[in-house]
Amino acid sequence: MAEKPKKPQKLRARLPRGLADRGPAEIAATRAMVEKIREVYERYGFEPVETPAFEYTDALGKFLPDQDRPNEGVFSLQDDDEQWISLRYDLTAPLARYVAENFDQLPKPYRSYRFGWVFRNEKPGPGRFRQFMQFDADTVGSGSPAADAEMCMMAADTMEALGIPRGSYLVKLNNRKILDGVLEAIGIGGDEHIKQRLVVLRAIDKLDRLGLQGVEQLLGEGRKDESGDFTRGASLNAGQIRDVITLLNFAGWGDIVDGSNTHTLDEWEGLRFSVNSTFSAGIQDLRQITKITEASGYDTGRIRVDNTVVRGLEYYTGPVFEVELLLDTKDEKGRPVRFGSVGGGGRYDGLVSRFRGEPVPATGFSIGVSRLQAALTLIGQLGNKPQAGPVVVTVFGGEIAGYQKMVATLRKAGIRAELYLGNPKHSLGQQMKYADKRNSPCAIIQGSDEKQQGIVQIKDLILGAELASLEKDRDEYLKKQAEAQFSCKEDEMVAKVQELLQRRGVAWG
Amino acid sequence: MAEKPKKPQKLRARLPRGLADRGPAEIAATRAMVEKIREVYERYGFEPVETPAFEYTDALGKFLPDQDRPNEGVFSLQDDDEQWISLRYDLTAPLARYVAENFDQLPKPYRSYRFGWVFRNEKPGPGRFRQFMQFDADTVGSGSPAADAEMCMMAADTMEALGIPRGSYLVKLNNRKILDGVLEAIGIGGDEHIKQRLVVLRAIDKLDRLGLQGVEQLLGEGRKDESGDFTRGASLNAGQIRDVITLLNFAGWGDIVDGSNTHTLDEWEGLRFSVNSTFSAGIQDLRQITKITEASGYDTGRIRVDNTVVRGLEYYTGPVFEVELLLDTKDEKGRPVRFGSVGGGGRYDGLVSRFRGEPVPATGFSIGVSRLQAALTLIGQLGNKPQAGPVVVTVFGGEIAGYQKMVATLRKAGIRAELYLGNPKHSLGQQMKYADKRNSPCAIIQGSDEKQQGIVQIKDLILGAELASLEKDRDEYLKKQAEAQFSCKEDEMVAKVQELLQRRGVAWG
C-alpha cells in the first residue's frame, strides 16, 4: 500500500507567555485613563517627550530588581554592528539617555512626561506580564525637595482624577538615605559592601509579600520558599538583623494625630542611628518635603512617611515614594485581592550623571498603567460595557452598489454604519444575528418590494432586545413591537436613524 | 613614576541607528492624526483590537519585501523555552493570528482596527526607520468585492479627514491576479516558479524608484546599482520581459474621460492575456469594486485602477491598493520631495487560513502614520508651533512652602503652573529666561515686600516679547509696559491670571 501523503501541519495560533491581546473595552479604558493622567501631569507643567522602544544595552544599565544574572529581565539582541541593544524595561533609563544627549538644548530644570509600553523578560507566572504600560513624569536638573514634594502631590492628584476617593489610596514616602545610614551604622557602608547592601534592599522590598519573618531570613543566611527553591540572604549577623528589623518596626503608622508627619519623623530621629549623618540627612529631606506637601493641604491621609518603602530599582539615591491602593476587593472568583503598589518613583541623582560626568540631580514618578487599570476595572471605576456598534445595512439580492450607497449616506451624516459583508445569500435572521453580535442599535432592510416603493425598513435592535423580555399579547408589547420596526422613505433614512439613536441614548465616542 | 589612575570612561548618550526621539510638537501631531483616523475607521463600523509587540516567529511568517536571507528584516530572539519570538513587522500578520486564535467567539465578518509601533530591522539609510507607526483596518471573513471597495473609500475619506484636499491624493487599485495571469500566460505559473514570480513582483514594486529600465534589468539577468552592488534578476527571456513591460505600459493613465474606470478596464481586457482565466478574473474583481466605489460617488479623481501597483508584501492574493500623495513640495533644504505611497493594503486570503486549515478570506488597509506625518508636516497641515508652557511661580528666599502653595492654588483652578525648581538663589533674570524657554504666558513674582503687603506681581511674558520689538518712549510702548507687569492681591491671583490667559488667547489642550 502506498503511503498517504502527509497532511500539511497547521500552524498553531497562540501568543508567547506573558503577552496579551486587548479588546475594545480594555482599549477604551486605557485611553480614558491616559487622558486623565495626561491632564494632571500637564497641569503640573510637564511637557511630553518620547523615546523609542530600543536603547543601547549599556545606556539602559542594569538596575532591575530580582535579577541575578547579567541581562536577565531584559530583552536584548545583537545589532548588525555587533553592539547589543535592548528593549526598554522602564521609561526612566531612556529619559536619562535623552536628557544627557540633548542637555544643552533643554530648559533646566527639564520637566517632561511620557507613557508607553515597557518590556521585561520575566519568569512565567500568573499576572506576570512581559509587556505593560507605564506613565512617567520627571524633573531633571533640580535637587530641590520641592521637586520631590511635587511628585508626591501629583501622585495623589492623579489617583483622585482617576476616581479613586481620598482615603482609598496612600502616597508613602521614605528616603534611601535612612536605610543607607542604618547600614553604615551597622558596618556595611562603603563600596566593598555594595552587593551585600543590594541584597538587604531587595529583602526589605519583599516585606509586603513575605512578612517580617521572611525578610529576617533573607537578611540572614537565606530563605527556602514553598517550592523548595533557596534564595541566598545578605548574611548579616544577629545584631545587624535586629537593627534593621528595629527600623522596619518603626514605620510610624500608629501615631498620626493631627495629619502631620512631624511626629513620626521625630520618633525616627530618636533612634540611635541618628548619630549617623546619612541617616540624619535622610530625615531632614523628609522634613522639608512634608513641610511643603502639608502646607499645600496634603495631610497624612494622602502623603505619609513610611520607612518600609524602598522600591526595587537600584538607581534611586534619595527620597522614594510609592502609591498604594488601600481598597480590599474580590476577584471574579470571590477571593480577596489587595492591590498594593500601583506606582512609585524617587530621586535618581546618578542616572544622568553616568553620561555627563557631572552631577545632574533628578526625580520622577511612574504609574503602572496596566496594573492600575486592572485595579480600577475590579472596583468598577472603569466601564466594561461594550460601546454601541454600527448601524448594519442588510443585503437582499439586487445590486450591492445600491446598498453600499445607503451606507455611504449614513456615514456622510456622521453615523457609524456598515454593509453586511458576509455571504449576501444569508437569511435576514443570520444577518440580524451578526448585528446583535456587533451590538448594533439598528439595522436597515430593503427587499425588492421596498426598493420599488423607494422605502426602507428600520429595525430597532435595542427595543427588540427589550421586547424579548416582555410578555406577549399585552398592550405594551404590541405598542413596542410596532415601534421596533418601521418603514420610511429612502431620503428620510438618515433623519429617522438619528432620531432612533437619540431615543435610545446611543452616543459613540 | 606611578601610573595615573584611569579616569572612568563616560558612557556615550546615543540611540541605535534608525530610531528617533519625539518632542512635544511631534507627539501632539501624532495624537491629532490618530484621533482623526480613528474617527473615520469607527464611522466605517470597525472596532478596536490590539495585539502585543511580540509574536512567535512562525506565526508572523516571512512576508517582508526585499529580504533575501530568512529572518532578515525582523527583530527576533530566542525565548527561555528555545522558541523564537519576533517583534511584529506589521499589524496584519498578528491580526491573522488573533483572529485564528479567537475565531469562534468573533462576529464574522470580523471588522477591526488598531494602531501601534511596528519594527523592521532595515539596513541603514537616511529616512529608513526601524520603528514606525501604522494604523490598520481589516475585514476578515468576507470575500466580497464590497469589502475591498470599502477599504478604498475609507482610504480616501481618511486622507480628506486629515486635511489633504481632493486631487492631492489618489487611491490606486490593482489586482495581483492580473500580474499572476500574465505570468501564467508567459509560462511561469505553478508552484515550481514561485520564487521566480516573487522576484518579478519585487522588480515591479521598484518601478517608482528605478523606472522602467531598472525594472527591465531586474526582470532579466539583474541590475548593478550606483554603489556597484549587483541584484540578481528574475532571468526572464526577452519575449517574457516584453510581455510584462507591455502590461506596465498599459497603466491606463491617459484616457480618463468621465471619471469612470470602465474605459481603462476595457483596454486591459483587450490585451491578449485576457484569454488567461486568472487575468480575466482579476479584471472582473476590479469591475465589481469600481462599480461600487463609483456608485458611492468616488470617481477616478479619487480611486483609480493602475496596474503598476503590486505592493511589496508577499501575502496579498487579490486586489491591492495604495494611497499616493500627489503633492510636490520642498524639504528644509529646498529640494523637491515627492512623497509617494503613504498607505496601502489588499486582500490576503491565505494569512488566516495558515492557522485554520480552511479558507478565510480577508482584506485590509494600513496607513503609514509616521510617513504620512512627515508629509503633512512638510506641507504645513500639522501645527509645529509649540503649545504655551505653564505659568511659572518664581522663588525669592523665604519659605518654599509658601510659593508651592500658590502653585497648588493655580493648579486647583485648572491652570497649568509650576514652581521654579532650579537653584532658588538664581536671579529674577535667570528665572525669567527659564520661563521664556518654557514658552510660559506669565510669571508670578513675590519678594519679601510684596509678601508683607499680601500682593503678587504678574509678569505678562507674551506682551513682554511684543514690547521688545517696539520703539521705546512711544505712548504705545509705555502703555503696554504698564500692562506687561502689574500687581494684585494674593487672593485675586487666580482671577487675574485667568484674565491674562484669555486676553492672550492661551488655550491648552
Swiss-Prot record, chains A, B:
The protein's UniProt keywords, in alphabetical order, are: Aminoacyl-tRNA synthetase, ATP-binding, Cytoplasm, Ligase, Nucleotide-binding, Protein biosynthesis
What Enzyme Commission number does this protein have? 6.1.1.21
Q: Which reaction does it catalyse?
A: tRNA(His) + L-histidine + ATP = L-histidyl-tRNA(His) + AMP + diphosphate + H(+)
User: Where can this protein be found?
Assistant: Cytoplasm
Report the top EC class in one word.
Answer: ligase
This protein's major location comes to: cytoplasm
Gene Ontology molecular functions? ATP binding; histidine-tRNA ligase activity
Q: Which Pfam families match?
A: HGTP_anticodon, tRNA-synt_His
InterPro entries xrefs: aa-tRNA-synth_II, aa-tRNA-synth_II/BPL/LPL, Anticodon-bd, Anticodon-bd_dom_sf, His-tRNA-ligase, HisRS-like_core, HisRS/HisZ
The answer to whether the entry has keyword Nucleotide-binding is: yes
Q: Name a single GO biological process.
A: histidyl-tRNA aminoacylation
As recorded in UniProt, coiled-coil segments are none
What's a GO cellular component annotated to this UniProt protein? cytoplasm
Family in the record: Belongs to the class-II aminoacyl-tRNA synthetase family.
Summarize the subunit comment.
Homodimer.
Question: Which NCBIfam families does the UniProt record give?
Answer: hisS
For this protein, the record's HAMAP family field holds:
His_tRNA_synth
Q: Which PANTHER family match?
A: HISTIDINE--TRNA LIGASE, HISTIDYL-TRNA SYNTHETASE
Quote the protein name from its UniProt record.
Histidine--tRNA ligase
| Species, as recorded | Rhodopseudomonas palustris (strain TIE-1)
The gene coding this protein: hisS
